[in-house]
UniProtKB/Swiss-Prot annotation:
GO process terms (BP): mannosyl-inositol phosphorylceramide biosynthetic process
GO cellular component, one term: membrane
UniProt name for this protein: Uncharacterized protein L263
Molecular function as annotated in GO: mannosyltransferase activity
InterPro entries: Glycosyltransferase_domain, Nucleotide-diphossugar_trans
PANTHER family: INOSITOL PHOSPHOCERAMIDE MANNOSYLTRANSFERASE 1 (PTHR32385:SF15), MANNOSYL PHOSPHORYLINOSITOL CERAMIDE SYNTHASE (PTHR32385)
Superkingdom, natural source: Viruses
Organism: Acanthamoeba polyphaga mimivirus (APMV)
Organism taxonomic ancestry: Viruses, Varidnaviria, Bamfordvirae, Nucleocytoviricota, Megaviricetes
Length: 583
């Protein structure tokens, strides 16, 4: 929740300045893990403060237990916040009390709020609300008695300080007292519905009423894309927010199509700001753990986010491990890798027998033999190899397009996304890492030794960690435990066995792990923007029967079509057959 700074806003609706408003935020349910953003749009108070004079904020709950939770998660702002318990759910009398004190009211429930999207807002002139209609046989008999066909519940209610509002609330209280029953929430909704119909539908619908052309109220704040859109609209209204020039020519940034970060943008007016990400809308952020905040927001590959590469002297060993555990190694693939890998690179082929020899009598042995899925076996083989030797592991069906040198610099551990357009699931066709034993009385090549500290400074124990970041041995230990649970869980399907592993790796800070975009290692050329084609490092030719190719029209015009099948045919073709076609 952003702290309100009134210097950032200009009062634009002077006709409301003579009125004082109270915000009523009614929280009916919340868990211990919830923060205010889960049920109330975070920029509501900032946005409304630029429109009206807010005298106070009332945060209502139904019981003392909820009240104790909300003490820690209530929004932080300079406007007084009163935390109240309304065990009787007597919201109508609460509104009457505020009206008697000459205060206008805005009532919010879960997943609602207000955002400055338009320069003019007409939704504060009269009684207005977001409504939800309920058609239920359980209430049909009661509704028929009053000539009603539906029950209206109010998600957001604007009650300006005028005679119509007082009359409306008084009538609601009158009908609510006449109704018999123990369900207070139903009685309140029914009294609101009856009063609205008897007064000629005086409450304007914020969603459909043509008399409210500019509506800044929002509801159902559950979609991350919509929340981020509202946040950017809020930032654009503030004069000191300026859009950043996109770093698409800066080699220190990597572009991720479809993705964005679910965080509040940095204020670019701050002098000498150093940012770690910038989306294609020009909003920047400075997050130490960018990957845990990423989500699929955009609908096309031309919109996304730029993330800064790691800036350090760490270097992964230049050793490529090619995994062939499902079938015999293909000489065509092997020759391609041997051609592109030059000194000091090492190249090792691992088949099923060599993997079994490596993991014999280790903690990986039981997991590998119990794994039922090929993807599980491949991941176990990759991690067991990296733990001992470090370097880069790839599965069988990868062919190189350029050198892998750039992947070894600045990374402790790296993987890639599977397909950004469908989410932030990770791909394990390629994994790179420092040796997993690093820190357990092994030489750490990334620690500088001062002359007077002697040889002991070359060594670091597992407990040595000035920050709370994971070190490589801890990452491998955690991956072992997660894989062990995944292998033993018979309910895991082909697609979700790595869900917990994905979650763990995404939660690590950017100093411990880097996640590359999918097009680096598994590009869909038909959908990829042309300017990114030179970033592709390798192509994966493995086929999955349940994955259908996505085809969209691109701006690239060629007399030929590049497909994975065509590349595979060229690789499988015997060079002698090519000579036969030459006359």
């Amino acid at each position: 929740m952003s702290v309100v700074d009134k210097n950032y806003h200009k009062k634009t609706y002077h006709k409301y300045d003579h009125n004082k408003w109270v915000l009523i935020i009614y929280v009916k349910s919340v868990s211990h893990e919830t923060n205010i953003d889960k049920f109330f749009y975070e920029n509501t108070i900032d946005s409304l403060d630029s429109v009206i004079n807010i005298s106070s904020i009332c945060l209502y709950t139904l019981n003392d237990q909820l009240s104790k939770i909300l003490v820690d998660i209530q929004p932080k702002c300079k406007i007084p916040i009163n935390l109240c318990v309304d065990s009787d759910n007597d919201i109508l009398n609460t509104m009457k009390l505020h009206l008697d004190n000459n205060l206008s009211i805005i009532y919010f429930t879960n997943n609602t709020g207000f955002s400055v999207q338009q320069k003019q807002c007409h939704s504060l002139d009269c009684l207005s609300a977001y409504t939800t209609c309920i058609y239920d046989d359980l209430y049909s008999k009661v509704l028929n008695k009053f000539g009603l066909s539906k029950l209206i519940t109010f998600d957001t209610l604007v009650v300006p300080n005028n005679n119509d509002s007082r009359k409306f609330i008084d009538n609601c209280i009158y009908f609510c007292r006449k109704l018999i029953g123990t369900d207070n929430e139903f009685k309140i909704n029914l009294s609101l519905t009856i009063t609205d119909s008897r007064m000629g539908y005086i409450v304007k619908d914020l969603e459909t009423d043509l008399e409210i052309p500019n509506n800044n109220f929002v509801r159902n704040i559950v979609d991350k894309s919509f929340r981020q859109y509202l946040t950017e609209q809020f930032c654009s209204v503030k004069n000191n927010f300026k859009k950043c020039e996109l770093p698409w020519k800066d080699d220190n940034f990597i572009y991720y199509p479809y993705l964005d970060m679910n965080v509040f943008p940095c204020d670019e007016s701050v002098q000498n700001i150093s940012y770690t990400s910038c989306n294609t809308n020009g909003f920047i952020t400075n997050e130490t753990n960018p990957f845990g905040k990423l989500f699929t927001r955009f609908n096309n590959p031309y919109e996304g986010v730029y993330l800064k590469k790691p800036q350090n002297n760490i270097q992964i060993p230049k050793h490529l491990h090619h995994i062939w555990i499902d079938e015999e190694p293909s000489i065509n693939y092997i020759n391609l890798w041997k051609t592109i890998l030059v000194e000091p690179w090492k190249y090792t082929i691992w088949d099923n027998n060599s993997v079994l020899d490596l993991i014999k009598d280790t903690h990986w042995d039981q997991m590998y033999n119990c794994a039922k899925q090929s993807r599980q076996k491949q991941l176990i083989a990759m991690l067991s190899i990296l733990e001992k030797y470090g370097g880069i592991t790839i599965n069988a069906y990868n062919i190189p397009l350029k050198s892998l040198d750039s992947l070894t610099i600045g990374n402790k551990f790296f993987v890639s996304f599977l397909a950004e357009d469908t989410g932030t699931s990770l791909s394990y066709r390629i994994i790179g890492s420092l040796p997993g034993g690093l820190g357990k009385n092994m030489i750490d090549p990334n620690i500088s030794r001062k002359p007077y500290e002697g040889i002991n400074n070359f060594f670091r124990s597992v407990n040595y960690n000035k920050t709370n970041d994971f070190v490589i041995p801890e990452i491998f230990d955690k991956l072992k435990s997660l894989l062990h649970v995944s292998v033993l869980n018979s309910n895991n399907t082909h697609n979700n066995f790595s869900k917990e592993i994905d979650y763990f790796l995404l939660s690590l800070s950017g100093q411990n792990i880097f996640i590359y975009p999918s097009y680096y290692f598994n590009a869909n050329i038909s959908t990829l923007p042309k300017r990114l084609s030179n970033k592709i490092i390798m192509i994966n030719l493995q086929k999955y029967p349940d994955k259908k190719p996505i085809r969209i029209k691109t701006e690239v015009h060629r007399p030929y079509v590049v497909t994975k099948e065509a590349i595979a045919d060229q690789l499988n073709e015997n060079p002698k057959d090519k000579l036969k076609n030459i006359k």
